[in-house]
A protein has these predicted regions:
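A structural motif corresponding to the C-terminal end of an alpha-helix
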Residues: 74-86, 170-188, 224-245
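Structural recognition of the beta-strand scaffold that forms the well-ordered cores
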Residues: 37-49, 86-91, 125-130, 135-137, ...
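Secretory targeting and sorting signals
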Residues: 1-31
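Oxyanion-hole/transition-state-stabilizing segment in secreted/luminal serine hydrolases
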Residues: 49, 102-164, 195
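Short amphipathic alpha-helices and their capping/turn segments at secondary-structure boundaries
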Residues: 26-39, 104-128, 172-187, 288, ...
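Serine-esterase "nucleophile elbow" of acetyl-processing enzymes
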Residues: 32-93
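Catalytic His-Asp segment of secreted/periplasmic serine-dependent ester chemistry enzymes
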Residues: 194-299
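A solvent-exposed, charged loop/short amphipathic helix patch at secondary-structure junctions
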Residues: 52-66, 141-167, 202-218
Length: 299
């Protein structure tokens, strides 16, 4: 039987492939893809603070009690993906964007250390961080709102407004520029903060404000968090970074809800920070959904 020339070529090609398979030789169908190299920076919300309360430890990246971090968090979960390889986690509880006398490494100092260690460089594909909350005196605003029993929470409003004013001065562009100077090819993802307190009218609210502050103050504080996130988002995007909103992932799980994902209790240093559930069910899915790390992998 005669084959047309095209069929003869196809038959010959099939025979050649079959011979290779039967001989035991192997040829990869696709070039292997290396995972995206990933560095984490930031404050306590980047450092897993509260995920294993009351446990905390010195961050081995610094080896100093000036830089503490908590337990496994969204960063560790991201590192478990085949598409991601964490080369360094430099986040420190209490870190700020601006200069400080606390001794806690600032975000810029974290980036510099990561670069010195060889973790942050031109091959880095992803950098994540949360920062800005300590620059606006997060703890002081909570204290002011908790102490405010006025019907309209006027003292809390003043404290929150001052916090937004401070947020406008946070040097997000300078921070992104510093990171970009070490890792020119990296995607930089600036993560936001969740709303902390359940408010009146939510279906999961057990007590508005969680017993920490009045319902009026809780509403003011949460609005202030939204405003902080909006400022950070605008600044991050203007600087060429991505802003990752996490607030919606925590809806129904604030302090005072029937299923809170926040620490509040005797281990006061971890109060107002996410639990393990907060990091794994709040921050982590928000990160994966927004960043899409598999798309950053290069062959």
């Amino acid at each position: 039987m005669q084959f047309p020339s095209a069929c003869r070529r196809s038959a010959a090609a099939f025979a050649a492939v079959t011979a290779v398979i039967l001989s035991g030789a192997s040829t990869p169908a696709f070039a292997a893809q290396d995972p995206v190299k990933y560095v984490n920076l930031g404050d306590s919300y980047s450092a897993g603070w509260g995920s294993l309360a009351p446990t905390a430890a010195v961050n081995p990246a610094f080896g100093s009690p000036a830089c503490l971090h908590g337990g496994p968090d969204d960063v560790a979960l991201l590192d478990q993906l085949q598409s991601v390889a964490l080369t360094g986690d430099y986040a420190c509880a209490g870190a700020t964007v601006g200069a400080t006398t606390s001794g806690i490494p600032t975000i810029a100092q974290q980036a510099a250390k990561a670069s010195l260690d060889g973790a942050l460089n031109s091959t880095t594909g992803l950098v994540t961080l949360t920062a800005g909350g300590n620059d606006v005196n997060f703890g002081q605003i909570i204290a002011a709102c908790a102490a405010d029993t006025s019907p309209q929470a006027t003292g809390c409003q003043a404290a929150a407004a001052y916090g937004v004013q401070l947020a406008n001065g946070v040097d997000v562009a300078g921070t992104v520029g510093t990171i970009r100077g070490y890792a020119a090819n990296a995607k930089i993802a600036w993560l936001g903060y969740p709303r902390l307190f359940a408010t009146a009218g939510e279906s999961t609210t057990v007590i508005a404000g969680g017993g920490v502050m009045s319902a009026a103050a809780a509403a003011v504080f949460d609005k202030g968090t939204d405003q902080l996130n909006a400022v950070l988002a605008a600044k991050a995007r203007s600087a060429g970074a991505q802003f990752v909103d996490v607030a919606t992932k925590f809806n129904g799980h604030e302090i005072g809800s029937s299923g809170s994902w926040f620490n509040l209790g005797q281990y006061t240093q971890f109060n107002f920070h996410p639990t393990a559930d907060g990091y794994s069910k709040g921050y982590y899915p928000a990160m994966v959904s927004a960043i899409k790390p598999a798309q950053l992998v290069k062959g």
